[in-house]
Amino acid sequence: MTSHPPRNLGLDLVRATEAAALAAARWMGVGKPDEADQAAAEAMYGVLNTLDMQGRIVVGEEGKLGVHSPLDSGRMVGTGNGPEVDVVVDPVDGRRRLAQGHSDAISVVGVAPRDSMWSPSPAVYMEKIVVDRAAADAMVPECIDAPAAWTLALVARVKKKPVRDLVVFVLERPRHEHLVEEIRSAGARVLLRSDGDIAGAMMAAHPLIDVDLLMGAGGIAEGVIAACVVKALGGMMLGRLAPQTEEEWAAVRAAGLDTKAVLSCGELVRGNEIFFAATGITDGLMLEGVRLHGSEAETESIVLRAETGTRRKIHTVHRLTD
């Protein structure tokens, strides 16, 4: 039995994201994010268990719904045959956007060899900066603490465009009010989203999408998944623990975690045997959403393999059985 993921694993993973997207699409615009997430999680779990791998979920669903999910961290997925791998999942990235019928809700899964993914439990939040491959070599740890204007000027210089042409993805949160002011004062434009920072990282890292950076604090779970995407696309991500409450600070200190270390995507997910798949649930900048046509449905997905830099777009027509 090989310890290395097979080269076609990404094409198997996309079946899991397609199943999750199809299940979640039924809940688009009905105002019930928890129900959508639960349906997507169950569908994804069912497909993951058919894949020949010994998968351990490193970043899962616990904490989202207030109840246990089949995709909680620590759960094993796969047939029990095949390589030992770490698995990161988000059946619905952009839960609120999906519930409201908004754009860019996606279903995602990433896989890498066992023990290669950062898992700083019990920390919850981290600061993040993401750029594409054109600006990857310009990113330095100092960017995390530097004024936004400094980082924006750095990116603008290497991308040979004025700061006013830059677009920065930021989660719309009270904690980001000052960051948004900084970005706008520097002359750049802000793409504010209520949630979906995995999609935001994909936009910032993708060379063909007109989003230049992701900045701000978000979940560690989403950060580890984003690191898989960014590494596979050849971009760069910087991250650092950023506890948001006294309780989280206390837990992080008790665990002896380093809150000063700035990590790159290569440290968040080690090695190059990384596979990532995403399927659109609602229409977005990167992927079309699910199209339901009675007894059939259409999906659009992206499959990434870090080792080769391969990027596949897949359009699928599904025959529905219920």
Residue locations for each model-derived region?
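Gly/Ser/Thr-rich active-site loops/lids in small-molecule metabolic enzymes
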Residues: 188-198, 211-213, 218, 222-254, ...
